[in-house]
Swiss-Prot record:
Region named Disordered: 425-453
Provenance organism: Haemophilus influenzae (strain ATCC 51907 / DSM 11121 / KW20 / Rd)
Record-stated family: To phage Mu protein gp42.
Protein name stated in the entry: Mu-like prophage FluMu protein gp42
Location in or out of the cell: Cell membrane
Length: 631
């Protein structure tokens, strides 16, 4: 089924139409000239990194079996952090509960899964009650959690309950100092205590006993029992709500991660780290590393200087790319779609690297491959234009049909004659370039006042782009080699892949930031910079620090930090764009490339706006635009 796509164009054509048109075209051409050089450098670098990008996924996918981004995030951050937290939890529970430590740890995991409480919050509550002398596993914590759910309280409200009860138990009796926080949190203390006496005392009598200091620890136990009876099952009911289900899912996932790491992976990583620390201590003791700290320090300082020098050249490139990224994001419908495109790019890379050509929906496959080739300049000869690359990539990924605005006849404003514009739409099918060139009619000569095609300007400037500097080429090939080594190391032990997870984690978190609608341009730019910095830093660190694991790990995090700073600087530049004033006057001719099996139609309509003097008409032509005419 064909997708129903739409594209909006805003063109300032007020005043002298010919002059405004020329100015508009020149602005687009200038932007293209600045950006195409940077994008072609990045394009060639990406081509070299393609194997590395593919290999990075091969590291993460076998470990988790979900995908590159999810694998890097879970292994690099979530799973290791969870395993470390559970390890510390066992130690703390054993120290607090003594011989009951293992039983308390098992009870903790089950209780957190069965209630809206998170693991860390449950552990904290258990330890606070136990420290005060109250056994949390005898129903006390369940009573507090149920009552908190009954009144719709949050974690802070529950903390207030625990604090008041714990203080009273430590003192040995209740006073208004402990009762007031409970009353403020909707606990009917005296009514509950009176009910627990079986009607022997009234609420007023219980309040009088409090004033006389007669409500001791037995009264506190009675209060906890009464709170549990009064709110029995409230937490279980809360688990059926959306927030409760989300909380349960988080706890279940955390438990799953802990179990993954319990099957040897975490121990293997700890052993590798322990071996390195032991080796380092031996070298320090025997004097081998007397000069090592200075060597490492000098190396890192030199690397930082090199990265900062590189940053001076990278910053304007990032600014240019960032401007284009913002434009692409706007056309793609937001950074969320752009992040989906990045994910699809990885999958496309995996598929296109296979020797066997697969048929995936006829034209959809060829269109996807065409868009992919446009980005990576896979066509023989010169680099593809910026507009073609962007349109092809987005068209292949999210179904956007490439649309170009030609605006004016060739002779408009005193220029040459005949026909509409230049060849602004390129056929997606691969043809022999010599045949194409031979069949093309001669290009019309430009008049003095003619409008230059923005796409033609892009192609012209692309041909003049200088070669990528040697350091960039070296860095790109270094990524492929480093990641390739990471793939091989996976078979020898999961821990040896850790240095490469810095880059994978930066990619995964970057996609997460781009997909978050609440993040601003500066934060998105920081994410993009962090990805680039982590990759470059890992290469520099691996090359300069003679210890493989330490070199890549230190370099990736150093580079990630520097890249994030660079991205922040670029974000400041991008966060306050100048507003564009749009006035709708004139005639716009729109040429839309028709895909296979699409019926071409031609319409002309006058657009009415809220401005009285607007006179905007559109002429839409469907088909392939030729050199000397419409088709």
């Amino acid at each position: 089924m064909m997708a129903n796509n739409s594209t909006s164009f805003f063109v300032n054509l007020a005043g002298n139409v010919s002059q405004q048109a020329a100015r508009f075209s020149n602005s687009i051409a200038n932007m293209a000239n600045k950006n195409v050089s940077s994008l072609n450098k990045v394009s060639r670098a990406i081509s070299a990194v393609s194997k590395g990008f593919n290999g990075l996924g091969n590291i993460t996918i076998p470990i988790i079996g979900v995908g590159a981004a999810a694998g890097a995030t879970m292994v690099g951050k979530s799973m290791l952090r969870t395993a470390a937290d559970f390890e510390m939890a066992k130690i703390r529970m054993k120290q607090t509960f003594g011989e009951q430590g293992e039983a308390a740890d098992a009870w903790l995991k089950k209780f957190a899964t069965d209630t809206p409480m998170a693991f860390a919050d449950t552990q904290d509550a258990m330890m606070r009650l136990k420290t005060a002398g109250i056994d949390p596993m005898n129903g006390s914590l369940q009573a507090l959690v149920d009552y908190n759910a009954k009144v719709g309280g949050d974690k802070a409200n529950l903390d207030g309950y625990i604090s008041a009860i714990s203080k009273g138990f430590i003192k040995g009796k209740l006073s208004m100092e402990e009762i007031n926080p409970l009353l403020e949190r909707n606990v009917k203390v005296f009514e509950i205590l009176a009910k627990e006496t079986g009607g022997k005392y009234t609420a007023d009598q219980m309040q009088k006993m409090l004033q006389e200091g007669k409500l001791g620890r037995k009264a506190i136990h009675a209060l906890l029992r009464g709170m549990g009876r009064d709110a029995q099952g409230a937490a279980k009911e809360q688990m059926k709500t959306w927030d409760g289900l989300v909380s349960n899912l988080e706890d279940t996932w955390t438990s799953m991660q802990a179990r993954f790491m319990e099957h040897g992976a975490f121990d293997a990583l700890k052993k590798e780290l322990g071996d390195f620390v032991e080796w380092l201590n031996e070298k320090i003791d025997d004097g081998t590393l007397d000069d090592f700290p200075k060597t490492v320090s000098d190396t890192l300082i030199e690397a930082l200087k090199n990265l900062k020098e590189m940053a001076k050249d990278v910053k304007p490139v990032l600014e240019s790319i960032g401007s284009v990224m913002s434009w692409v994001s706007e056309k793609a419908g937001g950074y969320g779609n752009l992040a989906k495109f990045m994910g699809a790019l990885y999958l496309g890379n995996k598929v296109l690297r296979n020797d066997k050509v697969q048929t995936l929906g006829g034209w959809g496959w060829s269109g996807a491959k065409w868009g992919y080739n446009k980005i990576f300049n896979r066509k023989k000869g010169g680099a593809g234009g910026l507009a073609d690359g962007v349109a092809g990539a987005l068209g292949a990924t999210v179904g956007v049909t490439p649309v170009y605005v030609t605006n004016f006849p060739m002779g408009f404003g005193g220029g040459g004659g005949g026909g509409y514009g230049y060849d602004v739409i390129e056929d997606g099918r691969d043809k022999d370039k010599k045949t194409q060139k031979k069949n093309k009619p001669p290009r019309p000569k430009r008049g003095r006042g003619s409008v230059r095609s923005p796409v033609a300007a892009v192609a012209a400037s692309a041909a003049a782009v200088p070669k990528v500097a040697a350091p960039v080429t070296t860095a790109s090939s270094g990524v492929a080699r480093s990641v390739g080594n990471g793939v091989k190391s996976l078979g020898r032990g999961a821990s040896k892949a850790v240095p490469y997870l810095g880059t994978g984690l930066a990619v995964a978190e970057g996609v997460t930031v781009l997909m978050d609608d609440t993040t601003n341009t500066k934060e998105k730019s920081e994410a993009i910079g962090s990805i680039a910095g982590a990759t470059a830093g890992a290469i520099v660190g691996q090359a300069l620090i003679p210890i493989p694991v330490v070199g890549a790990a230190v370099g990736s995090y150093l580079g990630g930090w520097l890249g994030e700073w660079l991205g922040s600087e670029v974000g400041e530049y991008l966060s306050d764009p100048e507003p564009i004033k749009n006035e709708l006057n004139g005639t716009i001719n729109i040429a839309v490339k028709a895909s296979d099996q699409l019926i071409a139609t031609a319409t002309q309509a006058k657009i009415q706006t809220n401005q009285q003097r607007d006179s905007l008409e559109t002429a839409v032509q469907m088909g392939t635009l030729g050199m000397g005419g419409m088709w």
